[in-house]
Curated annotation (Swiss-Prot):
PROSITE patterns: FBOX. The keyword DNA damage does not apply. It comes from Arabidopsis thaliana (Mouse-ear cress). Keywords: Leucine-rich repeat, Repeat. LRR repeats lie at residues 101-124, 149-173, 175-199, 298-323. This is F-box/LRR-repeat protein At2g29910. Residues 4-50 form the F-box domain. It holds the Pfam family LRR_At5g56370. Transmembrane segments: none annotated. Gene3D superfamilies: 1.20.1280.50.
């Protein structure tokens, strides 16, 4: 009894779903199996393009052929582009433009080399989720009307910089439906260019990681103009001041990092609130940073998570401590006694 090719007898729609689960280079290679499979790669709705599979040889040609196959395909739900090797900048921009023109819903861009994305075409009426990480740096003219992504709801910028710091604000304002925003900038070797401003009436979940201890000037101030924000995860060295609008905030996770003089390096860690400083050793050294406005803006939240650094900052860098009338859950990595000395709550459940 001869063998039967059962999988080839499946409907095209099912085979397209199966191929979508494979790395795109593997899925494209099935076109040589038989005539039955010649056009099936055009049915995939997810692209996973990674030059780590097979190396850089022939990689640009492979992408060009793949995009040609998808000319008449259905909407691409998700596209992931991972570049470990260097390619021509105009070539990479052409690929990104093609992904967006094909109605991509989710786009993930990652590169080890540096590329400048031409923002004049960096726009989409269908994209709902965008992640940019690594060497990509948007720059150039704004798209017509200044709106990049009218349907975008989730934006993640990881280790990515804009040439112009004001582009952060313009980029966010160009996403009128944005609900989730993640910004991570903690590469010590790269000078920070974020303007320390998040302003959006639509953002509900915000994650910020901003660590530049060697650039004190990057921490002059910080604005959170986010009236509908319900969740905040914030990690940064303490700036000199805050301006916040957090009236809807329900939960906050804080990792507020003190500057070098707040560290008890001799003890190999952090001492208690009364022993971190030696007034005789640092008689004229001012305390850097002020979190008073930030803490006041958190006074209506229900859940608060604090790092040990945050407790130190609350103690030394907050001029007045509000009462947290609505707080139900407090978690922190320290002794309950220390937390009680620094904060005042009405009715809470302590988790340590």
């Amino acid at each position: 009894m001869g063998s039967r090719d059962l999988i080839s007898s499946l409907p095209d729609e099912i085979l397209g779903k199966v191929l979508s689960l494979l790395p795109t280079k593997r899925a494209a290679s099935t076109a040589v199996l038989s005539k039955r499979w010649n056009n099936l790669p055009a049915l995939v709705d997810k692209l996973d393009i990674n030059d780590a599979i097979g190396g850089p040889g022939g990689f640009p040609e492979f992408i060009d052929k793949t995009l040609a196959l998808l000319t008449n395909s259905t909407t691409i739900k998700r596209t992931s582009l991972n570049n470990e090797f260097q390619y021509g900048e105009s070539q990479v921009n052409t690929w990104i433009r093609s992904f967006l023109e094909r109605g991509c819903l989710q786009l993930y861009l990652n590169a080890q080399s540096l590329y400048t994305i031409d923002t004049e075409f960096f726009t989409s009426n269908t994209l709902v989720e965008l992640t940019i990480t690594g060497g990509f740096s948007p720059d150039g003219l704004l798209p017509p009307g200044g709106v990049f992504f009218p349907k975008l709801k989730t934006l993640s910028l990881v280790l990515m910089t804009f040439v112009d710091s004001d582009m952060y604000e313009l980029f966010i304002s160009g996403c009128p439906l944005l609900e989730e925003f993640l910004l991570r900038n903690d590469e010590i070797e790269i000078p920070p260019v974020w303007n320390a401003l998040v302003s959006s009436p639509s953002i509900k979940r915000l994650t910020i990681v901003h660590h530049f201890p060697n650039y004190r000037e990057a921490h002059d101030g910080c604005w959170f103009r986010t009236p509908n924000l319900v969740y905040l995860d914030y990690s940064s060295y303490v700036p000199d001041w805050y301006e916040v609008d957090l009236g809807s905030l329900v939960e906050a996770r804080l990792d507020l990092r003190s500057w070098e003089r707040l560290r008890d390096e001799k003890a190999g860690g952090y001492g208690d609130c009364d022993s971190v400083y030696d007034d005789e050793e640092y008689p004229d050294d001012p305390i850097l940073g002020d979190v008073t406005n930030l803490v006041t803006g958190l006074s209506n939240i229900k859940t608060l998570h604090l790092s040990p650094d945050s407790l130190e900052v609350f103690y030394f860098c907050c001029k007045s401590m509000p009462v947290f009338h609505n707080l139900l859950t407090l978690s922190f990595e320290s002794a309950k006694k220390e937390a009680g000395q620094c904060c005042h709550f009405s009715s809470i459940s302590l988790l340590t």
